[in-house]
């Protein structure tokens, strides 16, 4: 994983953890948790691609990896929708910057996961 992406994930997660949005903190904590899981999934998928011979063990270990992949794309779409929703509601510039960066990061990660998955298929 690119060091800028790691820094971006860490920066966004840190800033989100300091926020108090009008929506419940449970919603924000859920977003943070999903961001963290998405990062871990992306890292593990990237590592599998790096070890291209790992494709068969990945398929043997988890016959439903395509379903998992589909679920991750659904999570990304949900996170993108949530970021957009927050952006339309908030007037706080700190929140706007944070969620614009989160949105950009999600789009980058979605693209990377697509690239990794095509290499594994």
UniProtKB/Swiss-Prot annotation:
Motif (Nuclear export signal): 12-21, 85-94
Coiled coil feature spans: none
GO annotation, biological process: exit of virus from host cell nucleus through nuclear pore
Main localization of the protein described in the UniProt heading: virion
InterPro entries: Flu_NS2
UniProt keyword annotations, A-Z: Host nucleus, Host-virus interaction, Transport, Virion
Domain of life per record: Viruses
Keyword Calcium: no
GO cellular component terms, semicolon-separated: host cell nucleus; virion component
Location(s), subcellular: Virion; Host nucleus
Family label: Belongs to the influenza viruses NEP family.
Further comment found in the protein's record: Average number present in a viral particle is estimated to be 130-200 molecules.
Described function: Mediates the nuclear export of encapsidated genomic RNAs (ribonucleoproteins, RNPs). Acts as an adapter between viral RNPs complexes and the nuclear export machinery of the cell. Possesses no intrinsic RNA-binding activity, but includes a C-terminal M1-binding domain. This domain is believed to allow recognition of RNPs bound to the protein M1.
Description of how the protein assembles with itself and partners: Interacts with protein M1. May interact with host nucleoporin RAB/HRB and exportin XPO1/CRM1.
Protein name: Nuclear export protein
């Amino acid at each position: 994983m690119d060091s800028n992406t790691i820094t971006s994930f860490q920066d966004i997660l840190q800033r989100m953890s300091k926020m108090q949005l009008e929506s419940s903190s449970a919603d924000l904590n859920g977003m943070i948790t999903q961001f963290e899981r998405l990062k871990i999934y992306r890292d593990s998928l990237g590592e599998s691609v790096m070890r291209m011979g790992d494709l068969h063990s990945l398929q043997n270990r988890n016959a439903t990896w395509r379903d998992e992949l589909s679920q991750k794309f659904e999570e990304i779409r949900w996170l993108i929708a949530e970021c957009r929703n927050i952006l339309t509601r908030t007037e706080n510039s700190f929140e706007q910057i944070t969620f614009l960066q989160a949105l950009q990061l999600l789009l980058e990660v979605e693209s990377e996961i697509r690239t990794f998955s095509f290499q594994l298929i």
